């Protein structure tokens, strides 16, 4: 049993010379805060029944999450001209400033879950039947900051209607020990995902740049049915696992949808009636000390591939990432260790261009993130039993690259309609950088 409370707050300030012709310094302050508490209770019971051994696990999870957000900004003249009468004076153009606003009503999200499973062992077989019940309640709060954004004139309808969803999802897993080293596994599982508060209620518009983000209060929860099978092996020299999966979705939630047609670019989350995601994953580790190398030296690697398809129109799913591989050479001892890793990502070449617009404003087609390779060096040192220092040198070669998730989700805030190369550059990942963490286990 555990009770956890967490507060996460992000406060970001940006400043830029937005339009070179007017020389105005624009500042934007963005705040996002999440408060949540989670209560977990889990019980286990082991017993034998005939020739079978049972390990029953059951419990509940209660979670409450409160989210708040706002943004505001101003502008200062850095040169005289184009309406600016003095250096340091506020910009006279109203569009340069942003009244304190929010793109979504502050939601309170209550989730309650019950789960139970029975791990049944018999001879070389293991059976794992499981069931889960989820209940989600979403209560939006219409703050003045949100109303400043979505309905400053009172012309548009604004809903603060509470949403509730619930569903029972089963799962059944199966393993068979082929030998002492090799195990086959398979699984059937159903999934359930509810829409976000931003997709249901959030609204934002920037008519000067010709785009709006609209809510969709009619979004349905997403459901899925999936199968997975594979084989894993474990030896003194290392381990490996290979798996393939196939998932079918109903009412797949696409939060990056661009509405085609109209005089103003419009973005709105939608349900895709039917969708499919399939793929394969492989990972492995080789203990090099088993072949005469120094004790603790190893190499590891993983490759993941997924293929997504909108079954309504045959187009790709933009939420599916390109082929990715991670390979590393590491050294571990009880109190210290390090890892040199190389991440390789293929160019994103499967994009539904009808629902995606390039953040660089290129009307010839969507921006497809190029492939890249990034090298990272990480290490850890255990100071005491409870205190560990870890850190790393990331992107050692100072590679300029984009993650597809960052580019595709840029659409969801509407800014893909903003032309200008700077918008694309600020979506790049950090160059060469350093991070150090201190972990204290209490």
Where are these predicted regions, by residue range?
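Transmembrane beta-barrel strands of outer-membrane/channel proteins
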Residues: 1-7, 58-64, 129-135, 184-190, ...
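Face-selective signature of the C-terminal outer-membrane beta-barrel domain
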Residues: 1-147, 284
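Membrane-embedded beta-barrel scaffold of Gram-negative outer-membrane proteins
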Residues: 1-14, 177, 183-189, 199, ...
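Solvent-exposed loop segments that connect transmembrane elements
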Residues: 11-29, 72-102, 138-163, 198-217, ...
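Residues on the lipid-exposed face of transmembrane beta-strands in outer-membrane beta-barrel proteins
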Residues: 39-45, 114-120, 172-176, 229-233, ...
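Gram-negative outer-membrane beta-barrel transporters
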Residues: 43, 121-127, 136, 239, ...
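Short loop/turn motifs that connect adjacent beta-strands in outer-membrane beta-barrel proteins
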Residues: 46-55, 124, 181, 237, ...
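C-terminal beta-signal and adjacent terminal beta-strands/loops
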Residues: 192, 250, 297, 346-352, ...
């Amino acid at each position: 049993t555990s009770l956890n409370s967490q507060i996460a707050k992000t406060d970001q300030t940006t400043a830029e010379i937005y339009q070179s012709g007017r020389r105005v310094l624009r500042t934007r302050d963005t705040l996002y805060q999440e408060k949540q508490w989670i209560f977990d209770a889990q019980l286990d019971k082991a017993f034998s029944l005939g020739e079978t051994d049972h390990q029953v696990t059951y419990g509940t999870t209660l979670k409450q999450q409160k989210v708040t957000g706002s943004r505001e900004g101003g502008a200062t003249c850095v040169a005289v001209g184009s309406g600016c009468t003095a250096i340091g004076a506020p910009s006279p153009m109203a569009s340069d400033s942003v009244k304190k606003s929010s793109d979504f009503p502050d939601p309170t999200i209550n989730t309650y879950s019950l789960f139970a499973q029975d791990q049944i062992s018999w001879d070389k077989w293991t059976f794992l039947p499981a069931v889960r019940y989820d209940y989600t309640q979403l209560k939006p709060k219409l703050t003045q900051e949100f109303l400043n954004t979505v309905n400053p004139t009172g012309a548009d309808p604004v809903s603060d209607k509470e949403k509730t969803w619930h569903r029972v999802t089963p799962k059944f897993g199966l393993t068979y020990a082929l030998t002492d080293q090799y195990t086959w596994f398979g699984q059937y599982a159903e999934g359930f995902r509810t829409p976000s508060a931003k997709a249901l209620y959030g609204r934002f518009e920037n008519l000067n740049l010709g785009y709006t983000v609209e809510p969709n209060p009619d979004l349905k929860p997403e459901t899925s049915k999936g199968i997975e099978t594979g084989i894993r092996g474990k030896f003194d020299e290392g381990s490996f696992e290979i798996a393939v999966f196939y998932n079918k979705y109903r009412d797949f939630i696409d939060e990056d949808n661009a509405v085609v047609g109209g005089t103003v670019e419009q973005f709105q989350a939608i349900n895709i009636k039917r969708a499919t995601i399939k793929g394969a994953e492989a990972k492995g580790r080789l203990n090099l000390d088993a072949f005469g190398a120094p004790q603790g030296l190893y190499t590891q690697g993983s490759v993941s591939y997924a293929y997504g398809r909108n079954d309504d129109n045959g187009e790709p799913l933009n939420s599916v990432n390109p082929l990715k591989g991670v390979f590393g050479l590491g050294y571990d001892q009880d109190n210290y260790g390090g890892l040199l890793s190389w991440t390789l990502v293929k160019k994103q070449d499967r994009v539904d261009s009808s629902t995606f617009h390039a953040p660089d404003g290129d009307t010839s087609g969507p921006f497809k993130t190029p492939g890249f390779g990034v090298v990272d060096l990480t290490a850890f040192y255990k100071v005491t039993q409870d205190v560990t220092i870890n850190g790393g040198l990331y992107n050692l070669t100072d590679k300029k690259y984009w993650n597809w998730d960052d580019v595709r989700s840029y659409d969801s805030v509407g800014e893909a309609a903003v032309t200008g190369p700077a918008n694309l550059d600020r979506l790049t990942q950090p160059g060469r950088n350093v991070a150090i963490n201190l972990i204290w286990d209490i």
